[in-house]
Regions:
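Ligand-binding pockets and gating/stacking loops
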Residues: 2-477
């Protein structure tokens, strides 16, 4: 949405005008903690949805970072070891284990070794060996399940709590409940290197919530702030001129609303203009990794995933509430074939950065109030996927009946496993956990009763967890 901000030829980059300091920028624009939150805020009847608010009760976590492995990571190759698959190698699995989206064949043992880590003895695959150093801080939920084995609805369910209807995303609900801590940065940032995941910006949409609560997309394949957030700066007007133009837009939008009714899309676009305007100073600082010590940049790694994870930490410590790190455009974890090479490569891209983030947060005293979530939209089958002619593709099909996520940090009791899939890893059988249960647990850690965090729309109260959801109390510290 930020590419829309400077499509007005006269909205301009203050850095191309006589240089303006941060203090001067805020003074000229009336921004900052005591100033305008949104260009027209302060006018009669207008309030900002970004004003900071208290949760329902004392939170254990203040912020969230979500590592989203889009495509569906295989749980039986990462955090849910199933040694019995080796005994059945080359044989059809007993029971009802062939109800899969595509044709699958015999049992497919994991090509990766699992080891016990930490005092807890948590079993983790060799592909996440560096992350496993933090095993005693992690709670692995091995009994997740979704509704269908398709990417699009499962992405919507995991992100927005509904696989069918367009609903606000988790980050938008969090901003709705808490407001923004830093008014000059987006409260919700979604990073995806190389483009968009499937369903594009619907994954971080505000839905029927105010447009200011939508996620801000950043492409971390770039290093320059002008490319990280497209058109965040321009070259056609002074700061004061930009402010007057945005005020004019807001006035025109108000007239349109008065005569034709509110249009959420128009409001969302204008809010994106306002936020982009405010970000011109703070975003430059937050995304400038050269300000980090060389040792810190080396710890995270000079790779796209290392850089985006370090950017995420810089955003979190500057008050961003929710940062979602997608692995890449499309569905990179969709390992229908050649899973051994593909999964090893992709796990290797994020294993080091995840471990570095956890170490870094602990050193900074941020780990205890930062909730970390790792996972995808579903898991994968314990049986091998077959090609049209019946040959093995050496990969796994989609599996929504059972998969794993893990959490760490803010309010999580680490070094434990919640729930279980069956002996082959096909279906959640012990303490099955729905996506609504996951969302309810996360909201609880952030200080919210998920049943009370509601928004009135179309004549009824909506919530992220719809009409279900139970907190997984045993993993709450």
């Amino acid at each position: 949405v930020f590419s829309l901000f400077l499509s007005f030829s006269s909205i301009m980059n203050p850095f191309d005008c006589p240089m303006v300091s941060r203090r001067g920028f805020l003074a000229q624009t009336g921004l900052g903690l005591g100033g305008l939150l949104l260009g027209g805020a302060g006018r009669a009847g207008e309030t900002s949805p970004l004003i900071a608010r208290a949760p329902h009760f004392a939170p254990k976590a203040k912020r969230v970072i979500h590592f989203f492995l889009n495509g569906g990571p295989s749980h039986v190759d990462t955090f849910d070891p199933k040694p019995l698959l080796s005994r059945y190698a080359g044989q059809l699995l007993p029971g009802d284990y062939r109800r899969t989206e595509r044709k699958t064949g015999v049992a497919f043992p994991s090509p990766f070794q699992f080891k016990k880590y930490g005092q807890s003895g948590l079993e983790i695959s060799e592909v996440f060996e560096k992350t496993a150093a933090h095993a005693d801080s992690m709670a692995v939920v091995r009994s997740m399940y979704a509704q269908v084995p398709n990417h699009e609805p499962s992405l919507m369910l995991m992100n927005c709590g509904d696989s069918v209807q367009a609903r606000p995303s988790f980050g938008s609900w969090l901003l709705y409940g808490l407001g923004a801590e830093n008014q000059n940065l987006p409260g919700f940032v979604a990073m995806c290197p190389g483009g968009m995941p499937i369903k594009d910006s619907e994954n971080w949409q505000a839905g029927f919530l105010p447009g200011a609560l939508q996620g801000t997309f950043v492409d971390p394949q770039y290093r320059e702030v002008d490319r990280l957030i497209e058109n965040i700066r321009s070259g056609h007007a002074t700061v004061s001129t930009q402010r007057r133009q945005l005020d004019l837009l807001r006035e025109m939008n108000g007239r349109h609303r008065d005569s034709r009714g509110a249009d959420p899309r128009l409001e969302a676009r204008l809010e994106s203009f306002e936020l982009a305007f405010r970000m011109q100073v703070d975003a430059t600082d937050a995304f400038d990794l050269s300000r980090e010590p060389a040792s810190m940049r080396e710890m995270y790694g000079d790779t796209v995933h290392g850089r985006q994870t370090l950017m995420a930490r810089r955003l979190l410590e500057r008050g961003v509430r929710f940062v979602q790190l997608w692995h890449g455009a499309g569905q990179p974890w969709d390992h229908h074939e050649s899973i051994e090479g593909g999964l090893r490569a992709q796990a290797g891209q994020i294993d080091g950065p995840i471990a570095a983030l956890m170490t870094d947060l602990k050193q900074r005293g941020m780990f205890e109030d930062t909730l970390i979530l790792w996972g995808g939209e579903f898991g994968r089958t314990p049986s091998v996927e077959l090609a049209e002619g019946g040959a093995s593709k050496l990969g796994r099909d989609h599996n929504h009946y059972g998969f794993s996520v893990w959490m760490a940090g803010g309010g999580i009791k680490g070094g434990q496993v919640y729930g279980a899939t069956d002996e082959f890893g096909f279906k959640a059988v012990e303490n099955p956990a729905s996506v609504h249960d996951l969302h309810a647990t996360m909201l609880h850690l952030l200080g919210f009763d998920h049943e009370q965090l509601t928004y009135r729309h179309a004549g009824r109260d909506f919530r992220l967890t719809d009409v279900s959801g139970e907190v997984m109390q045993s993993i709450v510290a």
